[in-house]
Every structure is written in C-alpha cells, then in structure tokens.
C-alpha cells in the first residue's frame, strides 16, 4: 500500500507567521511537499509564485472567494441572485489556480441568507447550486482543473451553511453529472453531521477529489484527544488506495511545528522517515 500524501493548510497552520509566502517556506522546512489555502486573494500573486518556486511546493487547493465576508458571506455558489458574482469569483480563482499550477478549486456553496429559513429556500438554493456548478464544470474542464464541493457541518461550525452533509453533496453531484466536479471530504465535518465514517468513506471515496482532517470535537491535531481514531482512518484510506492529498486543516494546540509529531510518526511508520 502506498503511503498517504499530506499537505499543509496555510490558512490554519503556521499562522505564527503573518504572510502566506512565509507560511509556505515554513511548511517546506517542516517537511511538507504541498500546501493548500482558503483565500489568497489579498496576497500578491508574484510573491506566491516566488515562494512556490523557491520551495518547490505543490499547490493543491484554493477556495473561490467568499463574497462579502463583512456581510456574512461564505461562498456564493448556492445563493440565489448572486450568480454573476459567483462567476466573477470563479474567474479570479481560475486565474490564481493557473498561475500557481493548482489543479483543485473548492467551489464554496454559501449560507442560507440571513432572515430566511433553510426549508423555505432549500429547493431554490439547490437549483442555483446545480446551475452554477454546471457552469463551473464547463469553465474548469477547459482549463484542466477540478472543482470540489465540501459539506460543512451545520450542527456546530456553521448552522446556516447550505451544503452540510455528504449525502446531500452526493445527490447534487448526481444532478451535475460532470467529471470536473467532485466532493471534498472533510472528515471533521462528516463525523459531526453523520458519523458512520467507515461506511461513508467507502461509499463516497470514488466521487471524492480531496480530503481534509482534524480531530473532533475541538478541531486540533489528529493525535489530540477526541472521537476519531486516525490510525484506523489512515489505514482504511490506504486500503482503499486513495491517491489524492489529505489537507491538514486544524487548529494547532500550540505551535504548528510542535504539533506535527503525529505526521512525523506516520512518515516514520510508512517511509522510514521519508516524507511523501
């Protein structure tokens, strides 16, 4: 079985450093060969490219812009009436992805509009989401990029986020029916919403294009106290021959570097200490 590949989410890790290029260099020094990030759009693209060239890091994933974050936006793909803004954000994400040789873009669904009930808008939001994803599929297919949709739990993290379970995401992917759109499996969110991880991982891995991890419930390192046995989960993913990256999207309990012993232990157990 091939060892799993991990990437550092530099929106969550190495935040001891203020700038993304600095975090990229720190990630490379810590042994990572790849990184991902949420929103890089306030960082000069030339600086990101320079850091990438200096470190040799692979950029694995970025998100589409959130919209107006100050007004509570967290993505626009499923928000009725915001289709043009979504397309503009997608174009910007594609520009950054192409410049950074990043092949995956998380197409953020967004939140149920404030003052509205989820049940009242569910069908309209799903139709909007499917419509926007079909548009995105055409754009991404031409560019050789992969779009991802990620369920974010609505029990704890974000009660208003529209896409909140893997089952809902799978139904939407069936409606979109395009190989350029897949699922982003965040095991933290999946455990909170549904549990039953072994079954759900087996069931949905074939339609998954990226994985992210954090311990439940506090979203710290995988080896911190919590509900999940990551040794078992990693072995399961190896047995299922998962070939993609696993994003480390968690809140370090202390310094990022001190919290990476779980990863070094994994590298030692699989590669004799060599990172993959």
Curated annotation (Swiss-Prot):
Keywords: Isomerase. One of its GO terms (biological process) is glyoxylate metabolic process. It catalyses: 3-hydroxypyruvate = 2-hydroxy-3-oxopropanoate. Gene3D superfamilies: Divalent-metal-dependent TIM barrel enzymes. It holds the Pfam family AP_endonuc_2. Its EC number is 5.3.1.22. GO terms for molecular function: hydroxypyruvate isomerase activity. The active site is at 150 (proton donor/acceptor), 249 (proton donor/acceptor). InterPro entries: HyI-like, Sugar_Epim/Isomerase, Xyl_isomerase-like_sf, Xyl_isomerase-like_TIM-brl. Belongs to the hyi family. Catalyzes the reversible isomerization between hydroxypyruvate and 2-hydroxy-3-oxopropanoate (also termed tartronate semialdehyde). PANTHER family: HYDROXYPYRUVATE ISOMERASE-RELATED, ISOMERASE. This is Putative hydroxypyruvate isomerase. The gene is hyi.
């Amino acid at each position: 079985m091939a060892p799993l590949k991990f990437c550092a989410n530099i929106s969550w890790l190495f935040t001891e450093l203020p700038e993304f290029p600095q975090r990229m260099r720190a990630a490379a020094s810590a042994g990572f060969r790849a990184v991902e990030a949420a929103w890089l759009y306030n960082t000069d693209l030339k600086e990101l490219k320079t850091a990438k060239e200096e470190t040799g890091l692979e950029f694995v994933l970025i998100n589409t812009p959130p919209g107006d974050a100050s007004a509570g936006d967290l993505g626009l793909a499923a928000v009725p009436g915001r289709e043009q803004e979504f397309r503009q954000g997608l174009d910007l994400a594609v520009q950054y992805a192409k410049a950074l040789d990043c092949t995956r873009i998380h197409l953020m669904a967004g939140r149920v509009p404030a003052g509205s009930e989820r049940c009242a808008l569910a069908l309209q939001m799903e139709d909007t989401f499917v419509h926007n994803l079909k548009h995105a599929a055409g754009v991404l297919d031409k560019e050789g990029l992969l779009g991802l949709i990620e369920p974010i739990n609505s029990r704890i993290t974000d009660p208003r986020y529209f896409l909140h379970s893997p089952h809902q995401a799978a139904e939407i992917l069936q409606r979109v029916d395009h190989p350029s759109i897949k699922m982003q499996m965040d095991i933290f969110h999946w455990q909170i919403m549904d549990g039953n991880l072994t079954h759900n991982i087996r069931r949905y891995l074939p339609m998954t294009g990226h994985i992210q991890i954090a311990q439940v419930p506090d979203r710290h390192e995988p080896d911190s106290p919590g509900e999940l046995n990551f040794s078992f989960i990693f072995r399961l993913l190896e047995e299922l021959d998962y070939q993609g990256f696993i994003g480390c999207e968690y809140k370090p309990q202390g310094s990022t570097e001190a919290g990476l012993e779980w990863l070094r232990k994994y590298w030692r157990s699989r590669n004799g200490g060599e990172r993959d």
